[in-house]
């Protein structure tokens, strides 16, 4: 039988794994995904037949395969799509080699590596079994142990790869980052594009809409129970996601479809804001409509601010083209695993390998399981998040940092996060020659910090320092003078921190916000006075005001009655055993609002401006494993919602105490710590 007539062999991926590990993993440092291994086994079985294991040409093929894979920069993970592309490239190169070489030389080209040779074609023609079934001891070759440092990465906002959401195809599409001869665009002063501004709201809207439609309450568009569905939806969320009755399914109507349907009930999804006349309106990509919230009952436990995307239920009135809202709520949240499954486990952050035009990185399920088990083993890893406003120009702060470093030096954490602002007054340009400028003083403060750190050998050598800028830090402070500026915020310029860089072995000057990829977890860190902003811009509903007024009057009456009865027991003074402290209720409102909106700044541009080109870096799709919102204006909290642990370490110095939070990734447990200064 000639070489082209060899029968293919069916190879089990598990039989090929030891050989592929020796060549691809051990020699070239590649990780083989399960689908990639199956595709590779199928190709080798068709090309080399039953003697694929004893043939030296199989090894040569894997060597060529690995070389082309690295040549094309396809990343560390070998998947099925990449295997198909590389094998096709091998065939194309073989054709080119055939055309350029004489006939005799062609026998030694790559064609011999993708077809059975005459040596084992004879075995097949003699009646050999075409299925490789010989057992192989897999214990002889074990999986390569994972190094946790390969899966630990601090991701700067301006270096984060960009995926845009294709509305028509309902999938993410990679956007290639352009670079200039002067350097990456993130380092250049440029004006955001108008296209990014126009796409900002529709992208966010459709992400929320698709998330809502994946909810079980919206799966049946034929049945709709108006004026009660919102209440039942809230009951479902409070009950932990139990399915609704068959009569409670809801459907979303576009605003443009309200015309001519006077007096009917509808459920709308849109962004709430004030229009040019100063009235509240609801907006979606199809249009905008004025809303009447005088009789609206919002669901409790969340903030409603201009810029939030909400579900509003009510009656359309053609008189004045108004929508009278009866109830309003935030879109139902979605767990991280459910979102990743819906988008095909895309590696949006490029943690397991950067994506490019010819290769899209995905999260391998087997690898995620291995990383999860590795997390459980690394029980000594700790992340320490300090409170915000570490004012280095304050002598009390230097004393507090010294006491903190004394404690951490005995057992250095894996990561130490220091949120700004790092000066009590904003940095501004000064031309006064009689006194040092604010920039010189700012540099001197970091030089003093470097001098302090030099006393702690273990800390500066074993810990990764992550600095997050605040409102008073350069260069944004020069334009906004300490007022909250545009998001995201650039890292602190390197000219101010040269001595800290020399002292610390591992230091990262992060943006605001910054993401940390740690094994199977994703952490989002942001420094923002979000609590005060929510309170200042919260929408006032007349029905809620009336309820609060009645509760206040009732409380006053009860207090007067209590004064008359001096022998009341403590159980009679407690109105509800389920009543939570105000700080707990406040923290839950903040966390639920942010995670339901799946955006770190769910405000309009008038409230908190955003750099249009980088709005995608503020999206929480999927929600992170852990979210750290450093907000000195809010109470310290540790809240878990939809599987996302949310932490606020509070203010760094409060009543002569140093505040910080210690997070253990192996247990996903946070502990609040204090040190008296």
Swiss-Prot record:
The lineage of its organism: Eukaryota, Fungi, Dikarya, Ascomycota, Saccharomycotina. As accessory component of the DNA polymerase epsilon (DNA polymerase II) participates in chromosomal DNA replication. This is DNA polymerase epsilon subunit B. In eukaryotes there are five DNA polymerases: alpha, beta, gamma, delta, and epsilon which are responsible for different reactions of DNA synthesis. Belongs to the DNA polymerase epsilon subunit B family. Pfam families: DNA_pol_E_B. It is found in: Nucleus. Heterotetramer. Consists of four subunits: POL2, DPB2, DPB3 and DPB4. One of its GO terms (molecular function) is double-stranded DNA binding. Keywords: DNA replication, DNA-binding, Nucleus. GO terms for biological process: DNA-templated DNA replication; DNA-templated DNA replication maintenance of fidelity; error-prone translesion synthesis. Its main location: nucleus. One of its GO terms (cellular component) is nuclear replication fork.
């Amino acid at each position: 039988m000639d070489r082209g007539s060899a029968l293919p062999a069916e190879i089990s991926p598990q039989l090929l794994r030891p050989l592929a590990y020796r060549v691809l993993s051990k020699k070239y440092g590649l990780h083989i995904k399960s689908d990639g291994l199956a595709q590779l086994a199928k190709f080798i079985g068709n090309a080399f037949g039953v003697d694929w294991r004893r043939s030296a040409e199989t090894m040569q093929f894997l060597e060529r395969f690995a070389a082309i894979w690295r040549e094309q920069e396809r990343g560390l993970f070998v998947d099925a799509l990449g295997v198909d592309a590389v094998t096709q490239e091998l065939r194309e190169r073989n054709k080119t080699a055939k055309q350029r070489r004489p006939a005799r030389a062609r026998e030694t080209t790559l064609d011999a590596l993708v077809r059975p040779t005459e040596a084992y074609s004879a075995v097949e023609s003699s009646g050999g079994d075409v299925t490789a079934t010989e057992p192989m001891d897999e214990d002889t070759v074990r999986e390569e142990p994972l190094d946790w440092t390969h899966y630990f990465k601090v991701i700067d906002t301006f270096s984060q790869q960009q995926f845009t959401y294709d509305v028509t195809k309902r999938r993410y599409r990679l956007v290639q980052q352009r670079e200039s001869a002067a350097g990456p665009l993130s380092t250049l002063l440029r004006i955001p594009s108008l296209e990014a501004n126009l796409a900002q709201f529709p992208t966010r809207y459709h992400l929320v809409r698709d998330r809502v439609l994946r909810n079980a309450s919206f799966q049946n568009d034929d049945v709709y129970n108006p004026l009660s569905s919102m209440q039942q939806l809230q009951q479902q969320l409070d009950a932990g996601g139990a399915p609704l009755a068959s009569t409670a399914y809801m459907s979303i109507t576009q605003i443009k479809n309200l015309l001519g349907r006077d007096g009917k009930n509808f459920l709308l999804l849109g962004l709430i804001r004030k229009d040019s006349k100063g009235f509240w309106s609801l907006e979606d990509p199809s249009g905008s409509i004025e809303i009447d919230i005088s009789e609206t009952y919002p669901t409790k436990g969340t903030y409603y601010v201009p810029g939030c995307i909400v579900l509003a239920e009510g009656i359309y009135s053609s008189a004045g083209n108004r929508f009278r809202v009866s109830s309003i709520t935030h879109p139902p949240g979605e767990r991280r695993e459910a979102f990743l499954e819906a988008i095909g486990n895309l590696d949006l952050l490029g943690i397991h390998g950067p994506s490019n035009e010819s290769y899209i990185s995905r999260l391998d399920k087997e690898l995620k399981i291995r990383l999860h088990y590795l997390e459980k083993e690394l029980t000594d890893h700790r992340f320490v998040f300090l409170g915000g406003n570490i004012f280095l120009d304050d002598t009390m702060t230097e004393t507090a940092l010294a006491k903190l470093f004394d404690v951490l030096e005995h057992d250095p954490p894996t990561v130490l996060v220091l949120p700004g602002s790092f000066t009590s007054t904003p940095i501004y340009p000064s031309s006064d020659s009689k006194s040092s400028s604010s920039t010189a003083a700012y540099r001197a403060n970091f030089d003093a910090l470097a001098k302090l750190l030099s006393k702690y050998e273990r800390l500066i050598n074993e810990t990764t320092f992550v600095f997050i800028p605040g409102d008073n830090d350069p260069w944004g402070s020069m334009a906004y003078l300490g007022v909250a500026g545009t998001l995201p915020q650039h890292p602190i310029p390197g000219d101010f921190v040269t001595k800290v860089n020399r002292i610390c072995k591992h230091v990262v000057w992060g943006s605001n916000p910054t993401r940390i990829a740690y094994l199977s977890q994703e952490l989002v860190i942001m420094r923002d006075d979000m609590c005060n902003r929510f309170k200042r811009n919260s929408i006032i509903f007349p029905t809620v005001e009336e309820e609060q007024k009645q509760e206040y009057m009732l409380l006053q009456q009860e207090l007067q009655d209590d004064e008359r009865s001096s022998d009341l027991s403590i159980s009679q003074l407690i109105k509800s055993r389920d009543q939570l402290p105000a700080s707990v209720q406040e923290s839950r409102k903040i966390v639920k609002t942010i995670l339901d909106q799946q955006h770190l700044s769910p405000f309009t541009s008038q409230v908190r401006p955003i750099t249009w080109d980088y709005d995608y870096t503020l999206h929480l799709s999927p929600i992170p494993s852990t979210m750290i919102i450093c907000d000195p204006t809010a109470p310290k909290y540790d809240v878990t919602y939809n599987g996302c642990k949310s932490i606020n370490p509070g203010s760094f110095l409060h009543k002569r105490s140093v505040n910080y939070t210690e997070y253990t990734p192996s247990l996903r447990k946070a502990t609040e710590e204090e040190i008296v200064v």
